[in-house]
């Protein structure tokens, strides 16, 4: 009797497990063939335009440039490469975890209607190949509620829970419309061996100013502020300082200054000026100003003035090594 009970129990468990596996596989098969769940973009190299809109009226138009590795922002600015790369990565790695639970469906649809961000993805045509409606995260913060729209099928009536392959989290924060967050924060961008010359001017102590020059072979020379060539005591240190100028970013366009405060910076005399030139003829200038506090210069931040005349916030952690005095070499 006990033996028969064991056999019966094994058969029941086996049947249940087989049913679960069959049902799971069948559900996945149905989902993979469901055009309403086909969010992914197979070839992101064909994506040439992305339009993002939120429910507050904010928009961001990102367009691929044929002349640069950077995308343009609203036809006026340069977009952050890390942010556009993240979008393209999201487009290709997105996967559907499953449909929304029936009990949650109406609530999710209602929330999507009120808060979803619209993301249009273009591949050369006048109409988006796919439009995502990106909602909030799931209660567990391991997925995001989304709805798909395509020219062929229109807008899906079914919301899905999506995530990225190989990762856990939600996607909402990747799709933002704040222009200051989208704008490229690069001060200098001279990749590889394209950097030819760096000049750092210490306006308050001119004798600390210097220029480092390089030829296409990578040989460097050092000059003081008057243009006199100096002997290099530590070649590795000078080369290291020179190479630090290849890629430099400021902290933020949000400088926390009023318009009057910004104008005051523009009219002030800078503490430092950095001039950088490349072998391709490009050049860039960046001025630095002390950020004054009640106890003296701020220990963490300074103000910067871009070539285009915009006042930005910079981290001293990044820029202090770039304004070392000549005697340090």
What are these regions (language model features)?
Residues 1-329:
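Secondary-structure "cap/kink" motif recognition
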């Amino acid at each position: 009797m006990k033996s028969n009970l064991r056999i019966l129990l094994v058969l029941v468990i086996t049947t249940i497990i087989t049913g679960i596996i069959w049902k799971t596989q069948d559900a996945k098969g149905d989902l993979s063939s469901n055009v309403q769940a086909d969010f992914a973009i197979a070839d992101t190299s064909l994506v040439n335009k992305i339009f993002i809109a939120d429910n507050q009226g904010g928009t961001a138009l990102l367009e691929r440039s044929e002349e640069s590795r950077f995308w343009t922002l609203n036809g006026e600015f340069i977009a952050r490469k890390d942010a556009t790369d993240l979008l393209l990565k999201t487009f290709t790695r997105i996967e559907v975890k499953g449909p929304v639970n029936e009990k949650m469906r109406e609530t999710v649809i209602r929330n999507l209607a009120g808060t979803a961000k619209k993301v249009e993805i273009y591949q050369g045509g006048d109409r988006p190949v796919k439009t995502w409606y990106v909602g909030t995260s799931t209660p567990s913060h391991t997925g995001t509620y989304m709805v798909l729209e395509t020219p062929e099928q229109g807008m899906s009536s079914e919301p899905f829970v999506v995530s990225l392959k190989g990762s856990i989290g939600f996607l909402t924060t990747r799709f933002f419309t704040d222009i200051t967050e989208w704008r490229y924060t690069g001060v200098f961008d001279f990749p590889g061996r394209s950097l030819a010359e760096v000049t750092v001017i210490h306006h308050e102590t001119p004798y600390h100013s210097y220029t480092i020059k390089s030829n296409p072979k990578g040989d460097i020379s050092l000059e003081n502020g008057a243009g006199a060539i100096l002997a290099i005591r530590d070649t590795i240190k000078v080369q290291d300082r020179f190479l630090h100028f290849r890629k430099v970013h400021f902290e933020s366009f949000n400088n926390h200054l009023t318009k009057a405060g910004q104008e005051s910076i523009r009219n002030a005399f800078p503490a430092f000026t950095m001039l950088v030139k490349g072998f391709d003829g490009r050049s860039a200038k960046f001025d630095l100003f002390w950020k004054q506090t009640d106890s003296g210069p701020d220990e963490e931040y300074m103000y910067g003035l871009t070539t285009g005349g915009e006042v930005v916030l910079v981290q001293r952690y990044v820029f202090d090594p770039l304004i070392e005095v000549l005697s340090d070499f």
